[in-house]
Amino acid sequence: EVGENTVMSAQVGIAGSTKIGAWCMFGGQVGIAGHISIGDKTFLGAQSGVPGNIKGDQTLIGTPPMEPKAYFKSQAIFRRLPDIYKQLNELQKTVEELKNLK
């Protein structure tokens, strides 16, 4: 069931028994799990994966869907994870060395 004036880009996949409200917009390659409800005026960014119900009047992106500001911040951090991991390991070694000095 898809509400009126809802638009979807290419390659949107919607599993069975999902109800989608009116005035929604879905970017390309959005995937929606079955047996859930998506409220009116929900905007989903491209390649979002929706595992559960979404209340209306929201703009979301990602898997699981989140507010755009949080999504883009997490993507920026994700790119730096290898360096952050290396720094964390170095800090752990330094802490252990300092503990052993006591």
Give the positions of each predicted feature:
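Long, leucine- and charge-enriched amphipathic alpha-helices
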Residues: 66-102
